[in-house]
Design a protein with these regions (language model features):
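Short, solvent-exposed secondary-structure boundary/capping segments
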Residues: 68-72, 101-116, 194-216
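Surface-exposed beta-loop interaction hotspot
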Residues: 93-165
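Long terminal accessory segments
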Residues: 3-7, 14, 191-261
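Active-site-proximal polar cores
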Residues: 1-48, 115-131
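Short beta-strand-centered aromatic/proline hotspots
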Residues: 55-57, 87, 93-103, 177, ...
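Oligomerization/assembly interface segments of phage tail-like spikes and tubes
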Residues: 68-78, 151-165, 192, 206-217
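Short coil-to-beta transition motif at edge beta-strands of beta-rich domains
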Residues: 39, 78-90, 166-184
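Short, basic/aromatic beta-hairpin or loop at an interaction surface
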Residues: 51-73, 141-161
Length: 261
């Protein structure tokens, strides 16, 4: 009936869809993100040392019965607030946006992996020691790129690391070493076997994946600070061989494009 027009669903094909979408976005922000269902999220962008930007967001799948899924979350934010490769601090825990951040005209959606460790290493940009929250997976079942004979004789395991892509992490290369272990007295050393900077490149943002294989602990490794000795690696490649002048990656402090078409 004509008198019940106000009960009708919004018409997104009637020429007033922009107004309707703005109203729905307002409802998402003002009604949902202000409730107890929303969480406070600090966005650090693609550097853990950035000044964080605080937002409210929905974090989904917080109660999972599957081991493979318990370190994964989905996040819904206002449009343009997160990008792939952003580091997020939620309830005192670090998370990494590992997916292309898609968005309809109401909200942005991304997939998060839990950063289950912190890695110290010598930056190939500044040659200072830096610390990154990282996602680490046991990757023994995957191909590391090492020759099978070498792997069988000298290596016992391998790991897959996820880093936010920035002008520091894209400089990783084969044979660069890490110390990474909860055993601080006799830690395990790891050597890079493969680096993937392209597979998760979204509009210049994204993820750097590093496959590392177990290596020997050196007497010159800084066990106290958990920093591997890469002096010979740096000497071999040289400080002036391109490791200080790389193609710029957009410095992300969180956020990205907003398609309003």
């Amino acid at each position: 009936m004509a008198t019940e027009w106000y009960l009708m669903e919004p018409d997104v094909l009637g020429g007033f869809e922009n107004t309707e979408f703005r109203n729905w976005r307002g409802a998402f922000k003002n009604s949902i993100l202000t409730t107890d269902f929303a969480r406070t999220v600090d966005i650090y962008g693609n550097y853990p040392t950035n000044k964080p930007k605080r937002i409210r967001a929905l974090v989904l799948d917080q109660v999972e019965n599957s081991y493979n899924k318990m370190k994964e979350r989905q996040i819904l934010t206002e449009l343009g607030q997160i990008q792939c490769g952003d580091l997020l601090l939620i309830d005192g825990r670090w998370w990494l946006v590992i997916s292309l951040v898609d968005q309809n005209r109401l909200y942005s959606k991304g997939i998060l992996y839990y950063c289950n460790s912190v890695l110290n290493f010598t930056s190939l940009k500044t040659f200072n020691t830096v610390s990154y929250p990282v996602v680490v997976h046991n990757a023994t079942q995957y191909n590391s790129g090492e020759r099978a004979t070498d792997y069988m004789v000298t290596l016992s395991s391998q790991r897959l690391y996820y880093f936010p892509a920035n002008d520091e992490t894209i400089l990783f290369d084969n044979d660069y070493r890490f110390l990474h272990d909860r055993n601080k007295l006799h830690p395990s050393a790891w050597k890079i076997a493969q680096v993937d900077t392209e597979n998760d490149d979204w509009d210049g943002y994204g993820i750097v994946r590093v496959m590392a294989v177990e290596d020997e602990l050196l007497m010159t490794d800084d066990v106290e600070n958990m920093v591997a000795d890469n002096s010979k690696w740096i000497e071999k490649h040289g400080k002036n061989s391109g490791y200080q002048s790389v193609e710029d990656i957009p410095p992300s402090d969180g956020g990205g494009w907003i398609d309003m078409t």
